[in-house]
Amino acid sequence: MAEKKQWHETLHDQFGQYFAVDNVLYHEKTDHQDLIIFENAAFGRVMALDGVVQTTERDEFIYHEMMTHVPLLAHGHAKHVLIIGGGDGAMLREVTRHKNVESITMVEIDAGVVSFCRQYLPNHNAGSYDDPRFQLVIDDGVNFVNQTSQTFDVIISDCTDPIGPGESLFTSAFYEGCKRCLNPGGIFVAQNGVCFLQQEEAIDSHRKLSHYFSDVGFYQAAIPTYYGGIMTFAWATDNDALRHLSTEIIQARFLASGLKCRYYNPAIHTAAFALPQYLQDALASQPS
């Protein structure tokens, strides 16, 4: 029997992970990035950009539930949601489950990502692209948040790592633009890497976001696809109370929402804001 091909992630030079490739479904270099989708017996369909795993069918629900339900339920009455990135449609899928949300705008820099994900990752979007509340904008995220006349209650930055096209979504210009189009009391969240291996990313984001928001922090989730431990999500708002809501308040909102989740629950919500001491120490040691 012929040995299966292997796909090796190239995010780190000295260590990493690989996937056995059962079948390559799509591989093309677009105007912005090198994109591949392949099948793996353990993780289902896997999508990678520029040599870095972005999502798998096996565990994507953890990432997307935590990126959406934490800010939306903490906010409590979000009507207008902005997603930066998220071309695979899974973030959109989770936001559409909130029936009180009136409009969902998604800004994706690469139209090719949206088109092939509709074809090759149908379980991710699960028909959410057809939701009447949804509007797709093909634009650079930094440009959009600094130019739009729209305002939002929750902004979700479903960004790649801060290399290549995703680098601009970790800049002060982007964070300032998000503050500009965020309604009073609104919440900004963003993917911020695996803090044990990418601690400098969290420190840099915390420093930059603190220039624009009065309450900046992080919450976490364990997502097997992202090599190295716990995935960290940046959190920023001017409503200092939202990060510290009791489990009882979140529980009441969760029950009222009718959500049925596979990872997220109210206890996970409040526990996710507890950070390991090494990260707390690193953040505390930074100059104000």
UniProtKB/Swiss-Prot annotation:
Catalyzes the irreversible transfer of a propylamine group from the amino donor S-adenosylmethioninamine (decarboxy-AdoMet) to putrescine (1,4-diaminobutane) to yield spermidine. Belongs to the spermidine/spermine synthase family. Keywords: Cytoplasm, Polyamine biosynthesis, Spermidine biosynthesis, Transferase. Homodimer or homotetramer. It comes from the Bacteria. Spermidine binds at residues 64, 88, 158-161. GO terms for cellular component: cytosol. Its EC number is 2.5.1.16. Pathway: Amine and polyamine biosynthesis; spermidine biosynthesis; spermidine from putrescine: step 1/1. S-methyl-5'-thioadenosine binds at residues 33, 108, 140-141, 165. The keyword Transferase applies. The gene is speE. It catalyses: S-adenosyl 3-(methylsulfanyl)propylamine + putrescine = S-methyl-5'-thioadenosine + spermidine + H(+). This is Polyamine aminopropyltransferase. It is found in: Cytoplasm.
